[in-house]
Amino acid sequence: MSSQSSNTESLSRFPLWQVITPVRRKVILAMALAGLAALTSLGALLFLVWSLRDIRATPDAIPAWPLGGVIGCVVLTFVLRLQAFNTSHYAAFHLENILRSRLARKALQLPPGVLQQMGSGSVAKVMLDDVKSLHIFVADSTPLYARAIIMPLATIVILFWLDWRLAIATLGVLAFGSVVLVLARRRSEDMAQRYHKAREQVSAAVIEFVQAMPVVRTFDSGSTSFLRYQRALEEWVDVLQTWYRKAGFSARFSFSILNPLPTLFVLIWSGYGLLHYGSFDFIAWVAVLLLGSGMAEAVMPMMMLNNLVAQTRLSIQRIYQVLAMPELSLPQSEQQPQEASITFEQVSFHYPQARTGTALQEVSFHVPAGQIVALVGPSGAGKSTVARLLLRYADPDKGHIRIGGVDLRDMQTDTLMKQLSFVFQDNFLFVDTIANNIRLGAPDTPLEAVIAAARVAQAHDFISALPEGYNTRVGERGVFLSGGQRQRITIARALLQDRPILVLDEATAFADPENEAALIKALAAAMRGRTVIMVAHRLSMVTQADVILLFSDGQLREMGNHTQLLAQGGLYQRLWQHYQQAQHWVPGGTQEEVVENERQ
Protein backbone atom coordinates (compact mmCIF):
# COMPACT_ATOMS: atom_id res chain seq x y z
CA MET A 1 0.00 0.00 0.00
CA SER A 2 2.77 2.42 0.89
CA SER A 3 4.63 1.80 -2.34
CA GLN A 4 1.49 2.41 -4.31
CA SER A 5 0.77 5.67 -2.53
CA SER A 6 4.34 6.87 -2.95
CA ASN A 7 4.18 6.00 -6.63
CA THR A 8 0.95 7.96 -6.99
CA GLU A 9 2.46 10.88 -5.09
CA SER A 10 5.49 10.98 -7.37
CA LEU A 11 3.24 10.86 -10.41
CA SER A 12 1.13 13.71 -9.06
CA ARG A 13 4.26 15.87 -9.10
CA PHE A 14 5.00 14.92 -12.69
CA PRO A 15 6.03 18.13 -14.51
CA LEU A 16 3.20 19.27 -16.71
CA TRP A 17 5.47 20.67 -19.36
CA GLN A 18 7.57 17.52 -19.56
CA VAL A 19 4.58 15.68 -21.01
CA ILE A 20 4.60 17.90 -24.09
CA THR A 21 8.25 17.14 -24.87
CA PRO A 22 7.43 15.55 -28.28
CA VAL A 23 5.74 18.79 -29.40
CA ARG A 24 7.67 21.25 -27.23
CA ARG A 25 9.06 23.29 -30.12
CA LYS A 26 5.63 23.82 -31.62
CA VAL A 27 4.18 24.76 -28.24
CA ILE A 28 6.99 27.23 -27.56
CA LEU A 29 6.45 28.73 -31.01
CA ALA A 30 2.71 29.03 -30.36
CA MET A 31 3.33 30.71 -27.00
CA ALA A 32 5.90 33.07 -28.54
CA LEU A 33 3.42 34.08 -31.24
CA ALA A 34 0.72 34.60 -28.61
CA GLY A 35 3.13 36.69 -26.52
CA LEU A 36 3.96 38.86 -29.54
CA ALA A 37 0.24 39.22 -30.20
CA ALA A 38 -0.20 40.48 -26.63
CA LEU A 39 2.55 43.07 -27.14
CA THR A 40 1.09 44.25 -30.45
CA SER A 41 -2.34 44.60 -28.82
CA LEU A 42 -0.73 46.85 -26.20
CA GLY A 43 0.94 48.69 -29.04
CA ALA A 44 -2.49 49.34 -30.56
CA LEU A 45 -3.63 50.93 -27.28
CA LEU A 46 -0.52 53.09 -27.08
CA PHE A 47 -0.98 54.24 -30.68
CA LEU A 48 -4.60 55.03 -29.83
CA VAL A 49 -3.49 57.19 -26.89
CA TRP A 50 -0.97 58.88 -29.18
CA SER A 51 -3.82 59.61 -31.61
CA LEU A 52 -5.93 61.14 -28.82
CA ARG A 53 -3.03 63.30 -27.72
CA ASP A 54 -2.48 64.59 -31.27
CA ILE A 55 -6.19 65.22 -31.78
CA ARG A 56 -6.35 67.15 -28.51
CA ALA A 57 -3.28 69.19 -29.46
CA THR A 58 -4.34 69.88 -33.08
CA PRO A 59 -8.07 69.17 -33.52
CA ASP A 60 -8.03 70.08 -37.22
CA ALA A 61 -5.27 67.63 -38.18
CA ILE A 62 -5.73 63.90 -38.77
CA PRO A 63 -3.12 61.86 -36.84
CA ALA A 64 -2.28 59.60 -39.78
CA TRP A 65 0.78 57.91 -38.31
CA PRO A 66 -0.78 57.02 -34.95
CA LEU A 67 -4.00 55.80 -36.60
CA GLY A 68 -1.96 53.78 -39.07
CA GLY A 69 -0.11 52.30 -36.12
CA VAL A 70 -3.43 51.33 -34.52
CA ILE A 71 -4.63 49.61 -37.68
CA GLY A 72 -1.29 47.90 -38.26
CA CYS A 73 -1.09 46.61 -34.69
CA VAL A 74 -4.69 45.32 -34.80
CA VAL A 75 -4.05 43.43 -38.07
CA LEU A 76 -0.74 42.08 -36.79
CA THR A 77 -2.38 40.99 -33.53
CA PHE A 78 -5.06 39.09 -35.43
CA VAL A 79 -2.52 37.34 -37.68
CA LEU A 80 -0.24 36.41 -34.76
CA ARG A 81 -3.11 35.04 -32.66
CA LEU A 82 -4.46 33.03 -35.58
CA GLN A 83 -1.05 31.54 -36.27
CA ALA A 84 -0.49 30.86 -32.56
CA PHE A 85 -3.71 28.86 -32.23
CA ASN A 86 -3.09 27.04 -35.52
CA THR A 87 0.35 25.99 -34.29
CA SER A 88 -0.91 24.91 -30.86
CA HIS A 89 -3.78 22.90 -32.36
CA TYR A 90 -1.46 21.06 -34.76
CA ALA A 91 0.80 20.31 -31.79
CA ALA A 92 -2.18 19.05 -29.77
CA PHE A 93 -3.33 16.71 -32.55
CA HIS A 94 0.20 15.34 -32.85
CA LEU A 95 0.54 14.86 -29.08
CA GLU A 96 -2.89 13.19 -28.90
CA ASN A 97 -1.82 10.71 -31.55
CA ILE A 98 1.48 10.02 -29.75
CA LEU A 99 -0.16 9.43 -26.36
CA ARG A 100 -2.94 7.20 -27.67
CA SER A 101 -0.38 5.16 -29.61
CA ARG A 102 1.79 4.81 -26.49
CA LEU A 103 -1.21 3.76 -24.42
CA ALA A 104 -2.30 1.24 -27.06
CA ARG A 105 1.22 -0.24 -27.21
CA LYS A 106 1.31 -0.32 -23.43
CA ALA A 107 -2.02 -2.15 -23.31
CA LEU A 108 -0.59 -4.79 -25.63
CA GLN A 109 2.40 -5.25 -23.29
CA LEU A 110 0.39 -5.46 -20.07
CA PRO A 111 -0.88 -8.75 -18.68
CA PRO A 112 -4.51 -9.14 -19.80
CA GLY A 113 -5.49 -9.64 -16.17
CA VAL A 114 -4.33 -6.11 -15.33
CA LEU A 115 -6.59 -4.62 -17.99
CA GLN A 116 -9.49 -6.70 -16.73
CA GLN A 117 -8.92 -5.40 -13.19
CA MET A 118 -8.91 -1.80 -14.44
CA GLY A 119 -12.27 -2.29 -16.14
CA SER A 120 -13.40 -1.09 -19.54
CA GLY A 121 -14.70 2.21 -18.13
CA SER A 122 -11.32 3.16 -16.64
CA VAL A 123 -9.38 2.17 -19.74
CA ALA A 124 -11.77 4.09 -22.00
CA LYS A 125 -11.55 7.18 -19.79
CA VAL A 126 -7.75 7.22 -19.87
CA MET A 127 -7.46 6.66 -23.62
CA LEU A 128 -10.31 9.01 -24.55
CA ASP A 129 -11.17 11.58 -21.88
CA ASP A 130 -7.76 12.04 -20.27
CA VAL A 131 -5.91 12.30 -23.56
CA LYS A 132 -8.59 14.70 -24.80
CA SER A 133 -8.09 16.81 -21.68
CA LEU A 134 -4.39 17.11 -22.50
CA HIS A 135 -5.31 17.98 -26.09
CA ILE A 136 -7.50 20.85 -24.85
CA PHE A 137 -4.69 22.11 -22.62
CA VAL A 138 -2.12 22.19 -25.43
CA ALA A 139 -4.46 23.46 -28.13
CA ASP A 140 -6.29 26.21 -26.26
CA SER A 141 -4.43 26.94 -23.04
CA THR A 142 -0.81 27.40 -24.04
CA PRO A 143 -1.43 30.52 -26.20
CA LEU A 144 -3.74 31.92 -23.51
CA TYR A 145 -1.09 31.22 -20.88
CA ALA A 146 1.47 33.23 -22.83
CA ARG A 147 -0.97 36.10 -23.23
CA ALA A 148 -2.04 35.95 -19.57
CA ILE A 149 1.61 36.23 -18.48
CA ILE A 150 3.16 38.57 -21.05
CA MET A 151 0.36 41.12 -21.20
CA PRO A 152 0.09 41.84 -17.43
CA LEU A 153 3.88 42.05 -17.07
CA ALA A 154 4.23 44.42 -20.00
CA THR A 155 1.24 46.43 -18.79
CA ILE A 156 2.69 46.81 -15.29
CA VAL A 157 5.97 48.07 -16.75
CA ILE A 158 4.09 50.67 -18.81
CA LEU A 159 1.88 51.64 -15.85
CA PHE A 160 4.92 52.21 -13.63
CA TRP A 161 6.40 54.30 -16.41
CA LEU A 162 3.20 56.37 -16.58
CA ASP A 163 2.50 56.65 -12.83
CA TRP A 164 3.77 54.37 -10.06
CA ARG A 165 0.81 55.20 -7.78
CA LEU A 166 -1.82 53.96 -10.21
CA ALA A 167 0.34 50.96 -11.02
CA ILE A 168 0.37 49.98 -7.34
CA ALA A 169 -3.41 50.49 -7.13
CA THR A 170 -3.87 48.15 -10.09
CA LEU A 171 -1.57 45.54 -8.56
CA GLY A 172 -3.50 45.75 -5.28
CA VAL A 173 -6.78 44.80 -6.95
CA LEU A 174 -5.17 41.93 -8.85
CA ALA A 175 -3.32 40.67 -5.76
CA PHE A 176 -6.51 40.59 -3.69
CA GLY A 177 -8.41 38.69 -6.37
CA SER A 178 -5.51 36.27 -6.84
CA VAL A 179 -5.39 35.43 -3.10
CA VAL A 180 -9.10 34.62 -3.14
CA LEU A 181 -8.57 32.48 -6.24
CA VAL A 182 -5.72 30.51 -4.63
CA LEU A 183 -7.90 29.78 -1.59
CA ALA A 184 -10.68 28.55 -3.86
CA ARG A 185 -8.25 26.26 -5.68
CA ARG A 186 -6.96 24.71 -2.45
CA ARG A 187 -10.48 23.79 -1.47
CA SER A 188 -11.17 22.17 -4.82
CA GLU A 189 -8.14 19.86 -5.19
CA ASP A 190 -9.67 16.98 -3.22
CA MET A 191 -13.05 17.54 -4.86
CA ALA A 192 -11.45 17.32 -8.30
CA GLN A 193 -10.15 13.85 -7.42
CA ARG A 194 -13.62 12.78 -6.26
CA TYR A 195 -15.20 14.29 -9.38
CA HIS A 196 -13.02 12.29 -11.78
CA LYS A 197 -13.52 9.11 -9.77
CA ALA A 198 -17.29 9.56 -9.87
CA ARG A 199 -17.19 10.31 -13.59
CA GLU A 200 -15.17 7.16 -14.16
CA GLN A 201 -17.86 5.14 -12.37
CA VAL A 202 -20.56 6.74 -14.53
CA SER A 203 -18.58 5.81 -17.65
CA ALA A 204 -18.25 2.19 -16.50
CA ALA A 205 -21.96 2.02 -15.62
CA VAL A 206 -22.94 3.39 -19.05
CA ILE A 207 -20.77 0.83 -20.86
CA GLU A 208 -22.20 -1.99 -18.75
CA PHE A 209 -25.77 -0.76 -19.22
CA VAL A 210 -25.47 -0.56 -23.01
CA GLN A 211 -23.53 -3.80 -23.54
CA ALA A 212 -25.78 -5.82 -21.23
CA MET A 213 -29.03 -4.37 -22.57
CA PRO A 214 -30.35 -7.60 -24.17
CA VAL A 215 -29.75 -9.55 -20.95
CA VAL A 216 -31.09 -7.03 -18.46
CA ARG A 217 -34.23 -6.35 -20.50
CA THR A 218 -34.94 -10.07 -20.58
CA PHE A 219 -34.54 -10.73 -16.86
CA ASP A 220 -35.49 -7.52 -15.04
CA SER A 221 -36.56 -5.02 -17.72
CA GLY A 222 -33.23 -3.26 -17.18
CA SER A 223 -34.18 -2.05 -13.70
CA THR A 224 -31.14 -3.46 -11.88
CA SER A 225 -28.59 -2.24 -14.40
CA PHE A 226 -30.37 1.09 -14.72
CA LEU A 227 -30.39 1.45 -10.93
CA ARG A 228 -26.62 0.92 -10.88
CA TYR A 229 -26.24 3.61 -13.55
CA GLN A 230 -28.65 5.90 -11.70
CA ARG A 231 -26.71 5.55 -8.46
CA ALA A 232 -23.41 6.33 -10.21
CA LEU A 233 -25.02 9.38 -11.80
CA GLU A 234 -26.47 10.54 -8.49
CA GLU A 235 -23.08 10.20 -6.81
CA TRP A 236 -21.50 12.25 -9.61
CA VAL A 237 -24.13 14.98 -9.21
CA ASP A 238 -23.66 14.91 -5.43
CA VAL A 239 -19.91 15.47 -5.88
CA LEU A 240 -20.61 18.39 -8.21
CA GLN A 241 -23.02 19.98 -5.75
CA THR A 242 -20.60 19.51 -2.84
CA TRP A 243 -17.78 21.00 -4.90
CA TYR A 244 -19.95 23.98 -5.80
CA ARG A 245 -20.89 24.57 -2.15
CA LYS A 246 -17.30 24.41 -0.94
CA ALA A 247 -15.61 26.50 -3.61
CA GLY A 248 -18.45 28.20 -5.46
CA PHE A 249 -18.53 31.47 -3.49
CA SER A 250 -14.74 31.90 -3.48
CA ALA A 251 -14.57 31.22 -7.21
CA ARG A 252 -17.41 33.62 -8.04
CA PHE A 253 -15.97 36.30 -5.74
CA SER A 254 -12.53 36.03 -7.34
CA PHE A 255 -14.16 36.26 -10.78
CA SER A 256 -15.87 39.45 -9.66
CA ILE A 257 -12.68 41.00 -8.28
CA LEU A 258 -10.57 40.11 -11.32
CA ASN A 259 -13.22 41.47 -13.66
CA PRO A 260 -12.11 44.65 -15.50
CA LEU A 261 -14.83 46.74 -13.79
CA PRO A 262 -13.32 46.78 -10.23
CA THR A 263 -9.91 47.70 -11.64
CA LEU A 264 -11.48 50.37 -13.81
CA PHE A 265 -13.37 51.77 -10.81
CA VAL A 266 -10.20 52.02 -8.70
CA LEU A 267 -8.28 53.67 -11.53
CA ILE A 268 -11.07 56.17 -12.23
CA TRP A 269 -11.41 57.09 -8.55
CA SER A 270 -7.68 57.38 -7.82
CA GLY A 271 -6.82 58.88 -11.20
CA TYR A 272 -9.51 61.54 -10.85
CA GLY A 273 -8.05 62.58 -7.51
CA LEU A 274 -4.58 62.90 -9.00
CA LEU A 275 -5.98 64.77 -11.97
CA HIS A 276 -7.99 67.09 -9.70
CA TYR A 277 -4.89 68.13 -7.78
CA GLY A 278 -2.99 68.68 -11.01
CA SER A 279 -0.41 65.97 -10.43
CA PHE A 280 -1.43 63.88 -13.41
CA ASP A 281 -1.94 64.40 -17.15
CA PHE A 282 -5.35 63.67 -18.68
CA ILE A 283 -3.97 61.72 -21.66
CA ALA A 284 -1.81 59.66 -19.32
CA TRP A 285 -4.93 58.97 -17.26
CA VAL A 286 -6.75 57.72 -20.37
CA ALA A 287 -3.78 55.48 -21.15
CA VAL A 288 -3.85 54.07 -17.61
CA LEU A 289 -7.60 53.37 -17.85
CA LEU A 290 -7.22 51.52 -21.16
CA LEU A 291 -4.17 49.55 -20.10
CA GLY A 292 -5.37 48.76 -16.55
CA SER A 293 -8.75 47.43 -17.62
CA GLY A 294 -7.10 45.51 -20.45
CA MET A 295 -4.68 43.91 -18.00
CA ALA A 296 -7.56 42.74 -15.81
CA GLU A 297 -9.24 41.28 -18.88
CA ALA A 298 -6.01 39.48 -19.80
CA VAL A 299 -5.76 37.98 -16.30
CA MET A 300 -9.35 36.65 -16.42
CA PRO A 301 -8.47 33.55 -18.50
CA MET A 302 -5.87 32.64 -15.88
CA MET A 303 -8.65 31.59 -13.49
CA MET A 304 -10.13 29.19 -16.01
CA LEU A 305 -6.65 28.07 -16.99
CA ASN A 306 -5.83 27.21 -13.39
CA ASN A 307 -8.84 24.91 -13.20
CA LEU A 308 -7.94 23.41 -16.56
CA VAL A 309 -4.33 22.88 -15.47
CA ALA A 310 -5.49 21.13 -12.29
CA GLN A 311 -7.74 18.86 -14.35
CA THR A 312 -4.94 18.26 -16.86
CA ARG A 313 -2.54 17.28 -14.07
CA LEU A 314 -5.01 14.66 -12.88
CA SER A 315 -5.36 13.38 -16.44
CA ILE A 316 -1.58 13.21 -16.81
CA GLN A 317 -1.36 11.36 -13.51
CA ARG A 318 -3.82 8.72 -14.71
CA ILE A 319 -2.10 8.44 -18.10
CA TYR A 320 1.30 7.91 -16.53
CA GLN A 321 -0.10 5.52 -13.96
CA VAL A 322 -1.07 3.30 -16.89
CA LEU A 323 2.26 3.86 -18.65
CA ALA A 324 4.11 3.04 -15.41
CA MET A 325 2.30 -0.26 -14.84
CA PRO A 326 4.67 -3.24 -14.76
CA GLU A 327 4.71 -5.15 -18.00
CA LEU A 328 5.16 -8.84 -18.49
CA SER A 329 8.83 -9.61 -17.99
CA LEU A 330 10.59 -10.34 -21.28
CA PRO A 331 13.95 -12.09 -21.60
CA GLN A 332 17.07 -10.37 -22.89
CA SER A 333 18.15 -13.55 -24.66
CA GLU A 334 15.19 -15.51 -25.97
CA GLN A 335 14.84 -19.29 -25.99
CA GLN A 336 12.85 -21.05 -28.70
CA PRO A 337 10.76 -24.14 -27.86
CA GLN A 338 11.61 -27.06 -30.10
CA GLU A 339 8.41 -29.04 -29.50
CA ALA A 340 4.88 -28.53 -28.18
CA SER A 341 4.87 -30.22 -24.79
CA ILE A 342 3.34 -28.37 -21.81
CA THR A 343 4.58 -28.55 -18.23
CA PHE A 344 3.14 -27.00 -15.07
CA GLU A 345 5.59 -27.27 -12.18
CA GLN A 346 4.33 -26.43 -8.65
CA VAL A 347 2.24 -23.54 -10.03
CA SER A 348 0.30 -21.38 -7.58
CA PHE A 349 -1.71 -18.30 -8.50
CA HIS A 350 -4.28 -15.96 -7.01
CA TYR A 351 -6.29 -13.14 -8.56
CA PRO A 352 -5.17 -9.88 -6.88
CA GLN A 353 -8.67 -8.52 -6.22
CA ALA A 354 -10.39 -11.84 -5.56
CA ARG A 355 -12.11 -12.26 -2.20
CA THR A 356 -11.59 -16.01 -2.24
CA GLY A 357 -8.35 -17.91 -1.76
CA THR A 358 -5.79 -18.96 -4.33
CA ALA A 359 -7.07 -19.94 -7.76
CA LEU A 360 -4.38 -22.61 -8.18
CA GLN A 361 -2.36 -24.36 -5.47
CA GLU A 362 0.89 -26.11 -6.37
CA VAL A 363 -0.42 -27.62 -9.60
CA SER A 364 1.97 -29.92 -11.47
CA PHE A 365 1.40 -31.93 -14.66
CA HIS A 366 3.12 -32.69 -17.95
CA VAL A 367 1.46 -32.93 -21.37
CA PRO A 368 3.57 -34.59 -24.08
CA ALA A 369 3.47 -33.02 -27.53
CA GLY A 370 0.49 -34.13 -29.58
CA GLN A 371 -1.71 -35.21 -26.68
CA ILE A 372 -5.26 -34.04 -26.03
CA VAL A 373 -5.72 -33.04 -22.39
CA ALA A 374 -9.12 -32.18 -20.92
CA LEU A 375 -9.55 -30.00 -17.84
CA VAL A 376 -12.73 -30.74 -15.88
CA GLY A 377 -14.16 -29.99 -12.48
CA PRO A 378 -16.79 -27.91 -10.70
CA SER A 379 -17.21 -24.22 -11.47
CA GLY A 380 -14.43 -22.14 -9.94
CA ALA A 381 -12.10 -25.12 -9.66
CA GLY A 382 -9.27 -23.44 -11.61
CA LYS A 383 -9.71 -24.93 -15.10
CA SER A 384 -9.91 -21.66 -17.02
CA THR A 385 -7.10 -20.23 -14.89
CA VAL A 386 -4.79 -22.96 -16.21
CA ALA A 387 -5.69 -21.99 -19.79
CA ARG A 388 -5.21 -18.28 -19.09
CA LEU A 389 -1.84 -18.74 -17.40
CA LEU A 390 -0.71 -20.74 -20.42
CA LEU A 391 -1.47 -17.62 -22.49
CA ARG A 392 0.38 -15.42 -19.92
CA TYR A 393 -2.84 -13.82 -18.75
CA ALA A 394 -0.56 -13.25 -15.77
CA ASP A 395 2.55 -14.84 -14.34
CA PRO A 396 2.15 -17.43 -11.57
CA ASP A 397 2.92 -16.44 -7.99
CA LYS A 398 5.06 -19.57 -7.65
CA GLY A 399 6.30 -22.28 -9.94
CA HIS A 400 7.05 -22.54 -13.65
CA ILE A 401 5.04 -23.03 -16.83
CA ARG A 402 6.99 -24.41 -19.78
CA ILE A 403 6.34 -25.08 -23.45
CA GLY A 404 8.83 -27.42 -25.06
CA GLY A 405 10.93 -27.18 -21.91
CA VAL A 406 11.18 -23.36 -22.13
CA ASP A 407 9.70 -21.21 -19.37
CA LEU A 408 7.08 -18.79 -20.70
CA ARG A 409 9.05 -15.94 -19.09
CA ASP A 410 12.02 -16.84 -21.29
CA MET A 411 10.02 -16.29 -24.49
CA GLN A 412 9.15 -13.10 -26.30
CA THR A 413 5.41 -12.49 -26.56
CA ASP A 414 5.43 -13.02 -30.34
CA THR A 415 7.22 -16.34 -29.92
CA LEU A 416 4.67 -17.52 -27.36
CA MET A 417 1.73 -16.48 -29.52
CA LYS A 418 3.20 -18.39 -32.48
CA GLN A 419 2.93 -21.55 -30.39
CA LEU A 420 -0.71 -21.06 -29.37
CA SER A 421 -4.11 -20.60 -30.88
CA PHE A 422 -7.12 -20.41 -28.63
CA VAL A 423 -10.90 -20.24 -28.48
CA PHE A 424 -12.46 -18.86 -25.32
CA GLN A 425 -16.07 -19.20 -24.25
CA ASP A 426 -16.33 -15.39 -24.31
CA ASN A 427 -15.56 -14.99 -28.00
CA PHE A 428 -15.00 -11.62 -29.65
CA LEU A 429 -15.72 -10.50 -33.19
CA PHE A 430 -14.77 -7.13 -34.67
CA VAL A 431 -17.07 -4.88 -36.68
CA ASP A 432 -15.73 -6.18 -39.98
CA THR A 433 -16.42 -8.85 -42.57
CA ILE A 434 -16.62 -12.48 -41.53
CA ALA A 435 -13.62 -13.25 -43.74
CA ASN A 436 -11.49 -10.60 -42.02
CA ASN A 437 -12.58 -11.84 -38.60
CA ILE A 438 -11.34 -15.31 -39.53
CA ARG A 439 -8.13 -13.81 -40.97
CA LEU A 440 -7.30 -12.04 -37.69
CA GLY A 441 -3.53 -12.28 -37.24
CA ALA A 442 -3.03 -13.37 -40.86
CA PRO A 443 -4.56 -10.58 -43.00
CA ASP A 444 -2.98 -11.77 -46.26
CA THR A 445 -4.53 -15.24 -46.12
CA PRO A 446 -6.33 -16.05 -49.40
CA LEU A 447 -10.07 -16.60 -49.33
CA GLU A 448 -9.64 -20.27 -50.24
CA ALA A 449 -7.78 -20.93 -46.98
CA VAL A 450 -10.40 -18.99 -45.04
CA ILE A 451 -13.16 -21.11 -46.56
CA ALA A 452 -11.24 -24.31 -45.80
CA ALA A 453 -10.91 -23.35 -42.12
CA ALA A 454 -14.60 -22.44 -41.99
CA ARG A 455 -15.54 -25.84 -43.46
CA VAL A 456 -13.58 -27.65 -40.75
CA ALA A 457 -15.26 -25.48 -38.11
CA GLN A 458 -18.70 -26.28 -39.56
CA ALA A 459 -19.22 -22.58 -40.35
CA HIS A 460 -19.15 -22.59 -44.15
CA ASP A 461 -22.80 -23.51 -44.70
CA PHE A 462 -24.33 -20.73 -42.59
CA ILE A 463 -21.79 -18.19 -43.89
CA SER A 464 -22.61 -19.08 -47.50
CA ALA A 465 -26.32 -18.66 -46.74
CA LEU A 466 -25.80 -15.03 -45.68
CA PRO A 467 -26.64 -12.34 -48.28
CA GLU A 468 -23.00 -11.35 -48.84
CA GLY A 469 -21.37 -14.59 -47.76
CA TYR A 470 -17.86 -14.12 -46.38
CA ASN A 471 -18.09 -10.37 -47.08
CA THR A 472 -21.00 -9.99 -44.65
CA ARG A 473 -20.15 -7.45 -41.97
CA VAL A 474 -20.95 -8.50 -38.42
CA GLY A 475 -22.19 -6.02 -35.82
CA GLU A 476 -20.44 -4.90 -32.66
CA ARG A 477 -19.09 -8.01 -30.89
CA GLY A 478 -20.87 -10.08 -33.55
CA VAL A 479 -24.40 -9.22 -32.41
CA PHE A 480 -25.90 -10.11 -35.80
CA LEU A 481 -24.90 -13.76 -35.34
CA SER A 482 -26.07 -16.42 -32.93
CA GLY A 483 -23.82 -17.56 -30.10
CA GLY A 484 -23.04 -20.83 -31.86
CA GLN A 485 -22.23 -19.06 -35.12
CA ARG A 486 -19.85 -16.66 -33.38
CA GLN A 487 -18.15 -19.58 -31.67
CA ARG A 488 -17.62 -21.44 -34.93
CA ILE A 489 -16.10 -18.35 -36.54
CA THR A 490 -13.61 -18.05 -33.68
CA ILE A 491 -12.81 -21.76 -34.04
CA ALA A 492 -12.17 -21.20 -37.76
CA ARG A 493 -9.91 -18.29 -36.80
CA ALA A 494 -7.90 -20.56 -34.48
CA LEU A 495 -7.68 -23.33 -37.08
CA LEU A 496 -6.43 -20.93 -39.74
CA GLN A 497 -3.50 -19.94 -37.53
CA ASP A 498 -2.27 -23.57 -37.67
CA ARG A 499 -0.20 -23.42 -34.49
CA PRO A 500 1.13 -26.46 -32.62
CA ILE A 501 -0.89 -25.90 -29.42
CA LEU A 502 -4.66 -25.39 -29.39
CA VAL A 503 -6.42 -24.09 -26.27
CA LEU A 504 -10.20 -24.56 -26.14
CA ASP A 505 -12.22 -23.03 -23.30
CA GLU A 506 -15.76 -24.40 -23.67
CA ALA A 507 -15.43 -24.32 -27.46
CA THR A 508 -18.77 -26.11 -27.95
CA ALA A 509 -20.68 -24.18 -25.29
CA PHE A 510 -23.06 -22.63 -27.84
CA ALA A 511 -23.35 -25.59 -30.22
CA ASP A 512 -26.89 -26.83 -30.74
CA PRO A 513 -27.52 -30.59 -30.50
CA GLU A 514 -27.79 -30.93 -34.28
CA ASN A 515 -24.33 -29.53 -34.93
CA GLU A 516 -22.54 -30.61 -31.74
CA ALA A 517 -21.60 -34.06 -33.05
CA ALA A 518 -20.35 -32.66 -36.36
CA LEU A 519 -18.43 -29.94 -34.55
CA ILE A 520 -16.80 -32.46 -32.21
CA LYS A 521 -15.82 -34.58 -35.21
CA ALA A 522 -14.38 -31.53 -37.00
CA LEU A 523 -12.45 -30.49 -33.92
CA ALA A 524 -11.09 -34.00 -33.53
CA ALA A 525 -9.71 -33.80 -37.06
CA ALA A 526 -8.28 -30.35 -36.38
CA MET A 527 -6.67 -31.54 -33.13
CA ARG A 528 -4.79 -34.34 -34.84
CA GLY A 529 -1.05 -33.74 -34.54
CA ARG A 530 -1.48 -30.85 -32.11
CA THR A 531 -1.17 -30.49 -28.37
CA VAL A 532 -4.64 -29.60 -27.11
CA ILE A 533 -5.73 -28.11 -23.78
CA MET A 534 -9.52 -28.38 -23.60
CA VAL A 535 -11.57 -26.87 -20.78
CA ALA A 536 -14.97 -28.55 -20.72
CA HIS A 537 -18.11 -28.77 -18.62
CA ARG A 538 -19.79 -31.20 -21.02
CA LEU A 539 -18.15 -34.46 -20.03
CA SER A 540 -19.16 -36.03 -23.35
CA MET A 541 -16.42 -33.88 -24.89
CA VAL A 542 -13.63 -35.43 -22.82
CA THR A 543 -14.21 -39.17 -23.09
CA GLN A 544 -11.72 -39.53 -25.96
CA ALA A 545 -9.06 -37.28 -24.41
CA ASP A 546 -5.65 -38.84 -23.83
CA VAL A 547 -5.55 -37.44 -20.29
CA ILE A 548 -8.22 -35.87 -18.09
CA LEU A 549 -7.13 -33.49 -15.32
CA LEU A 550 -9.78 -33.02 -12.64
CA PHE A 551 -9.56 -29.83 -10.59
CA SER A 552 -11.32 -28.92 -7.37
CA ASP A 553 -10.73 -25.88 -5.14
CA GLY A 554 -7.69 -24.86 -7.16
CA GLN A 555 -5.96 -28.22 -6.77
CA LEU A 556 -5.32 -31.05 -9.22
CA ARG A 557 -7.24 -33.92 -7.60
CA GLU A 558 -7.32 -36.69 -10.20
CA MET A 559 -5.48 -37.55 -13.42
CA GLY A 560 -6.04 -40.27 -16.01
CA ASN A 561 -8.16 -41.16 -19.01
CA HIS A 562 -11.93 -41.59 -18.91
CA THR A 563 -11.86 -45.31 -18.15
CA GLN A 564 -9.19 -45.00 -15.46
CA LEU A 565 -10.96 -42.18 -13.62
CA LEU A 566 -14.28 -44.04 -13.64
CA ALA A 567 -12.53 -47.07 -12.17
CA GLN A 568 -11.06 -44.97 -9.35
CA GLY A 569 -14.55 -44.22 -8.04
CA GLY A 570 -13.65 -40.68 -7.03
CA LEU A 571 -14.95 -37.21 -7.82
CA TYR A 572 -14.82 -37.76 -11.58
CA GLN A 573 -17.08 -40.80 -11.28
CA ARG A 574 -19.61 -38.75 -9.29
CA LEU A 575 -19.48 -35.92 -11.84
CA TRP A 576 -20.01 -38.46 -14.63
CA GLN A 577 -23.03 -39.93 -12.88
CA HIS A 578 -24.53 -36.47 -12.40
CA TYR A 579 -23.86 -35.70 -16.06
CA GLN A 580 -25.53 -38.92 -17.19
CA GLN A 581 -28.57 -38.19 -15.03
CA ALA A 582 -28.79 -34.68 -16.46
CA GLN A 583 -28.62 -36.07 -20.00
CA HIS A 584 -31.63 -38.34 -19.32
CA TRP A 585 -33.59 -35.76 -17.38
CA VAL A 586 -37.09 -34.81 -18.57
CA PRO A 587 -39.77 -32.75 -16.80
CA GLY A 588 -40.96 -34.85 -13.88
CA GLY A 589 -37.65 -36.69 -13.35
CA THR A 590 -35.28 -38.86 -15.37
CA GLN A 591 -36.61 -40.91 -18.26
CA GLU A 592 -36.38 -44.10 -16.17
CA GLU A 593 -38.32 -42.49 -13.29
CA VAL A 594 -41.05 -41.26 -15.65
CA VAL A 595 -41.43 -44.74 -17.20
CA GLU A 596 -41.58 -46.35 -13.74
CA ASN A 597 -44.25 -43.87 -12.59
CA GLU A 598 -46.36 -44.58 -15.69
CA ARG A 599 -46.19 -48.33 -14.98
CA GLN A 600 -47.50 -47.73 -11.48
Model-derived segments and their meaning:
Residues 1-41, 61-66, 84, 88, ...:
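Membrane-integrated ABC transporters
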Residues 21-80, 160-165, 282:
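Transmembrane helix-loop-helix hairpins at lipid-water interfaces of multipass membrane proteins
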